[in-house]
Amino acid sequence: MTSPATLKVLNAYLDNPTPTLEEAIEVFTPLTVGEYDDVHIAALLATIRTRGEQFADIAGAAKAFLAAARPFPITGAGLLDSAGTGGDGANTINITTGASLIAASGGVKLVKHGNRSVSSKSGSADVLEALNIPLGLDVDRAVKWFEASNFTFLFAPAYNPAIAHVQPVRQALKFPTIFNTLGPLLSPARPERQIMGVANANHGQLIAEVFRELGRTRALVVHGAGTDEIAVHGTTLVWELKEDGTIEHYTIEPEDLGLGRYTLEDLVGGLGTENAEAMRATFAGTGPDAHRDALAASAGAMFYLNGDVDSLKDGAQKALSLLADGTTQAWLAKHEEIDYSEKESSND
């Protein structure tokens, strides 16, 4: 039951068209510990949806939920995360997930925070599970997997259990809420660098500013021709957070990256098992060119953020080389056989 003091804070927030960051943290913190009744959660989410998500809403909610998250021992410097908001309705192959594996095979330290599908047929967890990459690792074994492979997956519900307090209301509302935007921001690894796709291009600058507030040193926010990916079917809008804290906005075309141009239909995917098979084909060099170039575009951005290359084009070409010479295929063949969820240490 919502306490009188908590209800007072909520009412003040609902009546405030321009809340501060501190006020947002104050109103979202009770939500992380289940202090709101469902009707009050619905009022908060609907109000933010109606007036439009602001910097304070997103940054404040992220800080409140990160404070309540279960910790992960490897954090910050040298880590990169990649995710998208989803909700673009395109139902493409798992581009960002596949690109993350290419980047990890090329030495980028990827701690990917994700979940099962919400708005598409296959979320990152669904396709990784189909690739025999373990999901339900305890913290110690997730660290071991990362140290062995440069990659580990942090299953969002395991590290952000506070989100469960809002799930019934989200499902009942049946419209997008601030939590569609929040998911990619809540990695307990608090990565130094991040690429995030947004289905709503109006959120690009806003998310870049939130990244800066959350301590990211370099980040890319992208919206590709209606999708939450770097597009090989049209123009991609980019907001780049640089190390000096400035945010630069620009556009890129597939040709700028040295890649082909395709249609969105060329990238349509299916269930997690189907997308996993498509990914294996791309890694083996037998998949469609559209799949190869789409994954290379996003992996290239990860190499760029990591400081391995000087441009997005150079990054895409590096990704193509890793696919062409079999590096990524060999990486997957090696590491899908490691399952620390079943491997007992000598101290067990």
UniProtKB/Swiss-Prot annotation:
What catalytic reaction does the record list? N-(5-phospho-beta-D-ribosyl)anthranilate + diphosphate = 5-phospho-alpha-D-ribose 1-diphosphate + anthranilate
GO cellular component term of the entry, any = cytosol
Write out the GO biological process terms: L-tryptophan biosynthetic process
**Required cofactor(s):** Mg(2+)
Q: Any idea which positions bind anthranilate 1?
A: G84, N115
The Enzyme Commission number assigned here is 2.4.2.18
GO MF: anthranilate phosphoribosyltransferase activity; magnesium ion binding
Q: Which domain of life is it from?
A: Bacteria
Do you know which InterPro entries this protein is assigned to? Anthranilate_Pribosyl_Tfrase, Glycosyl_Trfase_fam3, Glycosyl_Trfase_fam3_N_dom, Glycosyl_Trfase_fam3_N_dom_sf, Nuc_phospho_transferase
- Which residues make up the binding site for 5-phospho-alpha-D-ribose 1-diphosphate? 84, 87-88, 92, 94-97, 112-120, 124
Q: Which residues bind Mg(2+) 1?
A: T96, E229
Q: Where does Mg(2+) 2 bind?
A: D228, E229
Q: Which UniProt keywords apply?
A: Amino-acid biosynthesis, Aromatic amino acid biosynthesis, Glycosyltransferase, Magnesium, Metal-binding, Transferase, Tryptophan biosynthesis
Q: What class of enzyme is it?
A: transferase
Q: Which residues bind anthranilate 2?
A: R170
TM stretches of this protein: none
> Which Pfam families does this UniProt record tie to the protein?
Glycos_trans_3N, Glycos_transf_3
Entry cofactor note text? Binds 2 magnesium ions per monomer.
Q: In which pathway does it act?
A: Amino-acid biosynthesis; L-tryptophan biosynthesis; L-tryptophan from chorismate: step 2/5
Q: Which NCBIfam families match?
A: trpD (TIGR01245)
Q: Which family does it belong to?
A: Belongs to the anthranilate phosphoribosyltransferase family.
Q: What does this protein do?
A: Catalyzes the transfer of the phosphoribosyl group of 5-phosphorylribose-1-pyrophosphate (PRPP) to anthranilate to yield N-(5'-phosphoribosyl)-anthranilate (PRA).
Q: How does it assemble?
A: Homodimer.
Name of the featured protein: Anthranilate phosphoribosyltransferase
The organism of origin for this protein: Corynebacterium glutamicum (strain ATCC 13032 / DSM 20300 / JCM 1318 / BCRC 11384 / CCUG 27702 / LMG 3730 / NBRC 12168 / NCIMB 10025 / NRRL B-2784 / 534)
